[in-house]
Amino acid sequence: MPKIPPYNGFELGPIRPPSEAYSLLLRINRGCGWNKCRFCGFYRDVPFSIRRAEDVKKDIDLVKYWVDVIQNRQPPRQAKSEADYEALSMAYHWVQSGMRSVFFQDGNGLLMNPDELTDVLEYLNQTFPQIQRITTYARSDTINRLPLERLKRYRELKLNRFHIGLETGNDHILKMMRKGVTKQAQIEAGIKAMAAGIEINEFYMPGMGGREYARQSALDTADVMNQVNPDFIRIRSMALAENLEMYEDYEKGILTRPIDIETIGEIRLFLENLHGITSWVDSDHILNILLELKGRLPEDKDRMLALIDFFLDLPEDTQNLFRLGRRLGIMGQLSDLHNEVLVDKVKQTMDQAHVDKTNIDAVCDRLMIRAIPI
């Protein structure tokens, strides 16, 4: 285990799920304990270490101090460091958001020693008893190693939602991408977490298997969801940056990069094959084309499929206009195609940048890469 750095003030990790935008962020460990996935570059240069429980509790104390200042329960002092300012900023944001949820950063909060994590959870609840939800990223293999009773204890202490990177249910792609887990292990982890009373949020990454494995990935991933029935299914379209290890597969011709239209087709096949579950589906990530693709299964399934079909049935020029509008952040949903101001703005950009059907795919790919910190 790498040497744990000394406490140097309040820490923030690099990322969080979009759904945790209003949560207090507390860093439980630095980097990713696995850090071998060929499709991910978030933590490549971050040495992994698990923070001491005492250091996390110091972060909690600092946030509590600034919360009390903001709520006029404590006389203010001058912030002393950049870390102090980060704690103040986080406390202010959290107070404005209602102080109901907490997200543990970085890659897998369950890697902390179970007794120490329990200690942190107890302290967090004592300090902020109004908290309703505590969440963390969690790997399926880690969930499977933990006793069910330990997971139930976490749930009692309000650690009641896991964000799980399923990515795909296809074993071949999982092995190719060095995910370190099998389809069956992902099913078992999801069922186990839910048996403990913990909500699970499964991430699906369409496009990961290229054109070659898109169909099988959609079907196998749907099969996992059908067996687990997760509380949330969140779609995260694949973005292919040159600094990712998986980029080599595309250079060698092992995989072929799908374009937006093909990725949406994969998503449609996935949704079409979800049966007998009651999950909430959400397409809330900046990399997704159809942000309005969301709803409760099974009642909203036909509406979501109809939305996809509406896009796929658009003329190619209109599809390309919307794709560029989304990638530039000018358009947010398909209804924006009826907004003449936004349509004209995208058309002007296409004319000025000489974007047409011969280069739209390459342009959109570059814009996707710019949208994420990898």
Language-model-detected regions and their locations in the chain:
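Auxiliary Fe-S-binding modules of radical SAM enzymes
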Residues: M1-E20, N226, F232, L240-I374
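Hydrophobic faces of well-ordered beta-strands that scaffold small-molecule active sites
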Residues: L24-L26, V102, I134-T136, F162-I164, ...
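Aromatic/hydrophobic pocket-lining residues that form the small-molecule binding cavity
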Residues: V56, L117, P147, Q186-I187, ...
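Conserved strand-turn element in the central/C-terminal portion of the radical SAM core barrel
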Residues: D141, G165-K175, K192-S217, R236-E242, ...
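Catalytic cores of alpha/beta
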Residues: L146-K152, G210-Q227
